[in-house]
């Protein structure tokens, strides 16, 4: 890569970037020709200004905005900079120069360096922007004109001094940097350590000059303070800082908020503070108050009584601004006693008092400097929310944190309550929409319980239940009457094929009694729960699990799976007709059901055992003449009657053991 492509390499390194955006970046010049020299480069591959057209005007605006940002970041004045492009650039990639006017640098070594920034070879940003907007292109300078401009004499950019050579010019520029006033006046005063007689003015300009650096430092501090005071004026030129904008004022956030919520309503008219207002500016105050109420309404779960709205009597900024600040004063920027006193003493004038004084008196008088200094350092510090008093700001901030934490808990609780109320209102709205419209001659249909709707989602409102659905409805009502606070587990997620909500997510609550494990020869079997209505109904077409020859025999005390947990469908249970009074569904009692099943299975197993013994004797007589073979494993099981379920008594006897299973 050649030296002309060095800029492309520099912007690819993150450590070189001062400011970056999605469109352009800012870097420092490797060979600065002044104390401040920065380059603003676009990320798009644009070789030079000769490749620009009207479509790049927005790009130029972005480059100019970044140039202003880097000047503000460095804390220097914008008017002390030259911003523009080289008419004959030597480096590839379009770049905007942001260079200070002092030109005091060791990298300023040749006459070409000076003339490239202080002649027509340097095209200001505004001039290039206007030419591009008018002509849609930038043309090159003729070579003869370029050579003529490079050969121009070295003329100071801050006065009419003409230097014989570059060293004399650099010495003259150092004098301008040390004292912003005229250098010629300082030369006439002379120097007590260096004789000036016999020397020309141009030769004395670059001599060492022992000036009063204390006065210079003091002047620089004053200039810096004035620059900071104009911060609000600069923010008015950048619309990205605006939260709310109108034709007379804007709302923006405070750079160093003294509370959790701190906004400024800045007037666009040039008034320094409230002492310059008269009765004619009352409509302006009304408009600023309206904007303050708008920004307060945008803060959720925070009422207007928690805000202070007013002006500072002796403001720091050179622009009229109305403070809108929450009264918690919980902020890291609250660092000094003067910060607290500026909002909690007579230094802060509420909006109502300022408005009344302008209405009655027509003006507001400023306070004296002595009174202002005394109020700034006033002690003890009193809490604005209780009677707490202390002399240390750190103790006050710790106390204010407790108030803030309590209010935050109340706001969180209020948010939760509002959310619950909103959910309830939405549920009521959905029920109102689902309710059918009443005809003129029809009576209103009584609303059905939620449990019935959940169990029978396909049931239309107003349609009577079938005899098969009535027991299930009555059973569901009895269950939910006992479980007022809800079931112990999510009953809507039980693996019942008749349950339309069986695929819904679980409530992450475990059952108090886990289900009995069902293991088979090929792994665990899927759990089975029978329907909740009586057996032998047309809706129950699910095949119950029958005999499995590959399954290991059950223990003698076990009779098989329980098919119908409903007490009405177990042997001997009464099945009432729809509409008859039925008792509530009995609770599960493992010992009672187990003993009942054993008694039923013992009665049913006796005739089955007699039939099986007869079948086995016939099989043995038919196989006497055959060669004896080892019986297969499945024929060496216990009698079939011990593993059949409750419905085995109604089936045909089992086939002989030497026949193939169906």
Swiss-Prot record:
It is an enzyme of class 3 (hydrolase). Residues 653-662 have a biased composition (Pro residues). Residues 490-500, 600-626 have a biased composition (Low complexity). The keyword Kinase does not apply. GO terms for biological process: mRNA splicing, via spliceosome; single strand break repair. Residues 4-108 form the HIT domain. Residues 482-662 are annotated as: Disordered. Residues 501-513, 560-569, 588-599 have a biased composition (Polar residues). Its EC number is 3.-.-.-. Residues 570-582 have a biased composition (Gly residues). Keywords: DNA damage, DNA repair, DNA-binding, Hydrolase, Metal-binding, Nucleus, Zinc, Zinc-finger. PANTHER family: APRATAXIN, APRATAXIN-RELATED. This is Aprataxin-like protein.
């Amino acid at each position: 890569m050649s030296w002309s492509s060095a800029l492309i390499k520099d912007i690819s390194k993150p450590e070189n970037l001062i400011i970056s955006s999605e469109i352009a970046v800012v870097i420092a010049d490797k060979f600065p020709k002044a104390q401040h020299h920065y380059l603003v480069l676009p990320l798009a591959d644009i070789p030079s200004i000769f490749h620009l057209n009207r479509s790049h005007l927005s790009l130029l605006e972005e480059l100019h905005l970044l140039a202003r940002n880097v000047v503000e970041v460095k804390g220097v004045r914008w008017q002390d900079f030259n911003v523009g492009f080289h008419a004959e650039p030597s480096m590839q990639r379009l770049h905007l120069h942001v260079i200070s006017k002092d030109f005091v640098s060791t990298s300023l070594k040749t006459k070409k360096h000076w003339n490239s920034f202080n002649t027509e070879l340097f095209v200001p940003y505004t001039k290039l922007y206007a030419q591009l907007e008018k002509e849609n292109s930038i043309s090159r300078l003729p070579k003869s004109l370029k050579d003529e401009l490079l050969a121009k004499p070295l003329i100071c950019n801050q006065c009419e001094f003409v230097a014989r050579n570059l060293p004399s010019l650099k010495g003259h520029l150092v004098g301008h940097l040390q004292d912003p006033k005229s250098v010629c006046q300082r030369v006439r005063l002379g120097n007590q350590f260096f004789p000036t007689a016999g020397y020309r003015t141009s030769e004395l300009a670059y001599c060492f000059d022992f000036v009063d650096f204390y006065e210079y430092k003091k002047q620089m501090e004053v200039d810096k303070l004035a620059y900071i005071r104009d911060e609000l004026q600069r923010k008015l030129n950048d619309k990205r800082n605006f939260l709310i904008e109108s034709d007379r004022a804007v709302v923006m956030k405070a750079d160093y908020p003294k509370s959790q919520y701190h906004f400024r309503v800045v007037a666009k008219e040039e008034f320094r503070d409230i002492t310059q207002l008269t009765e004619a500016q009352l409509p302006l105050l009304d408009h600023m108050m309206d904007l303050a109420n708008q920004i307060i309404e945008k803060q959720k779960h925070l009422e207007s009584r928690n805000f202070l709205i007013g002006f500072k009597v002796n403001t720091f900024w050179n622009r009229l601004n109305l403070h809108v600040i929450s009264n918690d004063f919980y902020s890291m920027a609250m660092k000094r006693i003067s910060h607290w006193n500026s909002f909690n003493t007579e230094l802060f004038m509420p909006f109502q008092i300022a408005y009344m004084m302008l209405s009655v008196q027509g003006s507001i008088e400023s306070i004296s400097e002595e009174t202002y200094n005394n109020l700034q350092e006033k002690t003890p510090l009193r809490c604005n929310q209780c009677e707490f008093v202390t002399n240390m700001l750190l103790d006050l901030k710790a106390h204010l944190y407790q108030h803030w934490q309590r209010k935050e808990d109340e706001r969180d609780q209020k948010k939760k309550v509002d959310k619950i109320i909103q959910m309830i209102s939405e549920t009521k709205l959905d029920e109102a929409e689902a309710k059918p419209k009443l005809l003129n001659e029809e009576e209103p249909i009584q609303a059905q319980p939620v449990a019935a709707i959940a169990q029978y989602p396909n049931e239309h409102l107003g349609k009577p239940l079938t005899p098969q659905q009535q027991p299930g409805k009555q059973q569901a009502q009895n269950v939910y009457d006992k479980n007022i606070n809800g079931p112990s587990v999510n009953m809507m997620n039980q693996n019942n094929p008749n349950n339309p909500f069986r695929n819904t997510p679980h409530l992450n609550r475990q059952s108090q009694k886990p289900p009995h494990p069902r293991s088979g020869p090929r792994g665990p079997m899927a759990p089975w729960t029978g329907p909740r209505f009586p057996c032998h109904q047309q809706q129950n077409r699910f095949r119950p699990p029958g005999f499995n020859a590959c399954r290991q025999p059950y223990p003698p005390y076990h009779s098989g799976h329980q098919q119908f947990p409903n007490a009405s469908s177990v042997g001997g249970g009464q099945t009432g007709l729809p509409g008859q009074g039925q008792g509530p569904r009995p609770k599960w009692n493992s010992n009672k059901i187990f003993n009942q099943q054993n008694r039923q299975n013992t009665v049913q197993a006796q005739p089955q055992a007699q039939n099986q013994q007869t079948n086995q004797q016939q099989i043995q007589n038919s196989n006497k003449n055959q060669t004896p073979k080892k019986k297969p494993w499945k024929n060496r099981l216990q009698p079939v009657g011990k593993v059949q379920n409750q419905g085995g008594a109604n089936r045909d006897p089992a086939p002989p053991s030497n026949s193939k299973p169906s």
